[in-house]
Swiss-Prot record:
Protein purpose: F(1)F(0) ATP synthase produces ATP from ADP in the presence of a proton or sodium gradient. F-type ATPases consist of two structural domains, F(1) containing the extramembraneous catalytic core and F(0) containing the membrane proton channel, linked together by a central stalk and a peripheral stalk. During catalysis, ATP synthesis in the catalytic domain of F(1) is coupled via a rotary mechanism of the central stalk subunits to proton translocation.
Keywords: ATP synthesis, CF(0), Hydrogen ion transport, Ion transport, Membrane, Thylakoid, Transmembrane, Transmembrane helix, Transport
Protein name listed in UniProt: ATP synthase subunit b
Assembly, per entry: F-type ATPases have 2 components, F(1) - the catalytic core - and F(0) - the membrane proton channel. F(1) has five subunits: alpha(3), beta(3), gamma(1), delta(1), epsilon(1). F(0) has four main subunits: a(1), b(1), b'(1) and c(10-14). The alpha and beta chains form an alternating ring which encloses part of the gamma chain. F(1) is attached to F(0) by a central stalk formed by the gamma and epsilon chains, while a peripheral stalk is formed by the delta, b and b' chains.
Mode of membrane association: Single-pass membrane protein
Source lineage: Bacteria, Bacillati, Cyanobacteriota, Cyanophyceae, Oscillatoriophycideae
Compartments where located: Cellular thylakoid membrane
Transmembrane segments: 32-50
A single GO molecular function term of this UniProt record: proton-transporting ATP synthase activity, rotational mechanism
Gene that encodes it: atpF
GO cellular component: plasma membrane-derived thylakoid membrane; proton-transporting ATP synthase complex
Species annotation: Microcystis aeruginosa (strain NIES-843 / IAM M-2473)
Transmembrane helix found in the keyword field: yes
A Pfam match: ATP-synt_B
NCBIfam families the UniProt entry points to: ATP_synt_b, PRK07352.1
Length: 180
């Protein structure tokens, strides 16, 4: 049906062309003429629209570039600031580590000195305890010797020693014990 309509229009156009107005069915002749008119209209009216569209696009691209540049500058500033903070933090960490090492050395030295003092004190205490024990043993031995000597003297006295001999024996025993 559409084809019939087109054919009908084409035949009427041919008849009308003979009269002066109608559709020209010569494809090569009409297409070049129509294309040149269409191209002229597009250039004349399209230039303004296309220029406006391209101008808007150019301004949007320029704004996007400016915004990107601004964000880049802000990011660079923030990066520099954070790098400074990082450097300061590293310096502070080094100070803390150095202080900790110094403190550890000082504490180690203090502990070693205190341990040495404790060892010295223990040695002195042990020496005093040993000396006191020796003194106690010596006193106990002297007391036993004295008791044995007195017992020996008493037994000899009871057997009948003379009084002058007894006195000499007592004096000698006391002198041996450190009495006189």
């Amino acid at each position: 049906m559409i084809i019939d309509t087109i054919l009908l229009l084409a035949t009427e156009a041919k008849e009308a062309a003979a009269e002066g107005f109608g559709i020209n069915t010569d494809i090569l002749g009409t297409n070049l003429f129509n294309l040149s008119i269409l191209l002229g209209l597009i250039i004349f009216y399209g230039r303004k629209v296309l220029g406006q569209i391209l101008g808007e696009r150019q301004s949007k691209i320029a704004e996007a570039l400016a915004e990107a540049e601004n964000r880049k500058n802000i990011a660079a500033t923030a990066l520099a600031e954070e790098q400074k903070k990082l450097a300061l933090a590293k310096q502070e960490a080094e100070k803390i580590i150095d202080n900790s090492r110094s403190r550890a050395k000082a504490v180690t030295a203090d502990i070693a000195a205190q341990a040495e003092l404790d060892i010295q004190r223990m040695r002195e205490s042990a020496a005093k305890d040993l000396s006191a024990e020796q003194d106690r043993v010596l006193v106990e031995l002297r007391q036993r010797i004295t008791a044995l000597a007195l017992a020996n003297v008493e037994s000899q006295l009871s057997t009948g020693l003379e009084e002058s001999v007894q006195q000499t024996l007592i004096d000698r025993s006391l002198a041996n014990l450190g009495g006189k």
